[in-house]
From Swiss-Prot:
Belongs to the universal ribosomal protein uL29 family. Keywords: Ribonucleoprotein, Ribosomal protein. The gene is rpmC. This is Large ribosomal subunit protein uL29. SUPFAM superfamilies: Ribosomal protein L29 (L29p) (SSF46561). NCBIfam families: L29. GO terms for cellular component: ribonucleoprotein complex; ribosome. The keyword Ribonucleoprotein applies. It comes from Psychrobacter sp. (strain PRwf-1). Coiled coil: none annotated. One of its GO terms (molecular function) is structural constituent of ribosome. CDD domains: Ribosomal_L29_HIP. GO terms for biological process: translation. HAMAP family: Ribosomal_uL29 (MF_00374).
Amino acid sequence: MKISELRDKSVEELTGLLDEKQLDAFRLRMAKATGQLGSTHEVRANRRAIAQIKTLINEKQRGA
């Protein structure tokens, strides 16, 4: 999802999306640990998405 699309969402929607991404991150870590993860680039992309969502939540809460 693009950052411009994320900026249009409310804090509640972003929080829900953050929960989903964190669950995905857990699943990716488990797949990596068991050797079932074929595409390792997904781990980095997921971490980046989580960071972007957290940044936007923080910006919206601070009123920036």
